[in-house]
Design a protein with these regions (language model features):
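Outer-membrane beta-barrel translocator/receptor signature
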Residues: 65-66, 88-94, 100-183, 187-194
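Extracytoplasmic beta-strand/coil segments of soluble accessory domains associated
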Residues: 9, 26-74
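N-terminal periplasmic "start-of-domain" segments of outer-membrane beta-barrel proteins
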Residues: 1-20, 45-48, 67
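Short acidic/polar hinge/loop motifs at secondary-structure boundaries
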Residues: 58-60, 66-99
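Short, charged, solvent-exposed linker or helix-capping segments at domain edges/interfaces
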Residues: 3-5, 59-62, 80, 123-128, ...
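Short beta-strands and strand-coil junctions in structured, solvent-facing domains, enriched
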Residues: 1, 18-19, 35-37, 55-57, ...
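A general structural signal for stabilizing positions within well-ordered secondary structure
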Residues: 19, 26-29, 84, 103, ...
Length: 194
């Protein structure tokens, strides 16, 4: 029972995640005022809980994260990197603020973020899908398709499958059709792609 635990825990269920349209790590960071996400680029994001930092590049021994990210019970946090996750078909997200090293190890100095996926259910057939589409003026189209299916295989077994396809459209124009380098006189012609 969450009320019997002597630590700061926040649990956000599937209905609330769907209502807030949480699809990635940036959405998870917005679930709690104690969380900060430093999005350093693809595959190079870092969570901080309560402002506790790893020291970044000023740490000569390597920047081990102070906030651990778990998918179910599997740790995903590595030195200096957190993989980009597409969050779909999730049961809940648990945010454990404060030191968790005794239970979860050294990457939990400031806390843990646990993403718990939905488990197969032997009692019902369940399926669903979500489609998103968008466009940017003078850019290409964004689209995503997400689907899940739960199917009982007998009295004691079931299978649950989740999948997604995502395409982020670009909006940066290559306005420089060609460039001539001064020293060599070499010209790069990008006019077909500009």
């Amino acid at each position: 029972n969450i009320q019997d635990v002597a630590m700061s825990i926040q649990a956000i269920g599937a209905a609330e995640l769907d209502k807030k349209n949480i699809k990635g790590l940036d959405g998870i960071a917005n679930l709690s005022p104690a969380i900060t996400l430093d999005a350093g680029g693809p595959g190079n994001s870092t969570f901080y809980i309560r402002g506790v930092s790893d020291g970044g590049f000023g740490n000569p021994s390597g920047a081990a994260s102070t906030t651990a990210l778990y998918l179910d019970d599997q740790p995903l946090t590595t030195i200096g990197q957190t993989p980009d996750l597409h969050v779909y078909d999730i049961e809940r997200v648990e945010i454990l603020s404060g030191p968790q090293g005794t239970l979860y190890g050294s990457s939990s100095t400031s806390g843990n973020i646990k993403i718990i996926t939905k488990k197969p259910d032997v009692n019902s057939i369940d399926y669903g899908f979500d489609v998103d589409y968008g466009s940017i003026t003078d850019g290409t189209h964004d689209r995503s398709f997400e689907t899940y299916m739960n199917m009982p295989l007998g009295d004691n077994s079931a299978i649950r499958i989740s999948a997604y396809d995502l395409k982020d459209g670009g909006w940066i124009d290559n306005e420089l059709a060609s460039k001539t380098f001064t020293n060599s006189g070499f010209t790069i012609d990008n006019s077909a792609h500009a």
